[in-house]
């Protein structure tokens, strides 16, 4: 009798942990990394430059609003001219089947390096991204953004950029 109770208890413990482990696996898919490359300020022939960037999104912190589902993002980009932009902000994601439309807004800090003088250290990035689901955890996309200091500085030339994105959920 004791052996039967022990085996039943042991089975329940292992069954409970295995069910919980599956829940944790599903819940762990809430972190998204976006690696992208493209052309910084493609519309200015004198100052355009190749860029490389990385962005992190944590969907555990998302919120449903009247604008849709919003989640925080943080990232950085560097250009071949040693300019850099470090940012944090918010993005929304709208799904149309396998196609995703993702607008975002991120204030950040811009460091000129040998690149374009944007007029101020504080810059605001507005971005539109379109991506296609490759699998449940991967997307391939294209995005366009504009950096501007919103006239905080004496000059506000702005910069238009395009990027090719690879997004992966973990």
Name the predicted role of every residue range.
Residues 21-30, 44-45, 60-70, 95-101, ...:
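Short loop/turn motifs that connect adjacent beta-strands in outer-membrane beta-barrel proteins
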Residues 81-105:
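Helix-adjacent hinge/juxtasegments
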Residues 40-50, 76-87, 114-121, 151-159:
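Solvent-exposed loop/turn segments connecting transmembrane beta-strands
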Residues 56-58, 92-94, 132, 146, ...:
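Residue-level signature of outer-membrane beta-barrel architecture
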Residues 48-54, 132, 157-170:
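Outer-membrane beta-barrel "beta-signal"
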Residues 1-28:
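Cleavable N-terminal export/targeting peptides
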Residues 99-127:
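Mid-chain, well-packed structural core segment of small domains
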Residues 32-41, 67-79, 102-109, 143-148:
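Transmembrane beta-strand segments that form the barrel wall of outer-membrane beta-barrel proteins
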């Amino acid at each position: 009798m004791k052996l039967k109770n022990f085996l039943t208890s042991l089975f329940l413990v292992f069954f409970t942990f295995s069910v919980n482990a599956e829940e944790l696996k599903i819940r762990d898919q809430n972190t998204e990394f976006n690696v992208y490359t493209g052309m910084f300020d493609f519309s200015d022939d004198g100052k355009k430059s190749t860029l490389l960037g990385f962005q992190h999104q944590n969907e555990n912190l998302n919120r449903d609003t009247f604008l849709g589902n919003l989640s925080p993002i943080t990232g950085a980009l560097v250009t071949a001219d040693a300019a850099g932009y470090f940012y944090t902000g918010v993005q929304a994601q709208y799904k149309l089947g396998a196609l995703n439309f993702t607008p975002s807004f991120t204030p950040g800090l811009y460091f000129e390096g040998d690149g374009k003088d944007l007029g101020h250290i504080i810059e605001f990035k507005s971005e539109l991204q379109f991506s296609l689901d490759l699998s449940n955890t991967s997307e391939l996309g294209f995005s366009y953004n504009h950096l501007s200091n919103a006239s905080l500085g004496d000059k506000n030339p702005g910069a238009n950029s395009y990027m090719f994105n690879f997004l992966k959920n973990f």
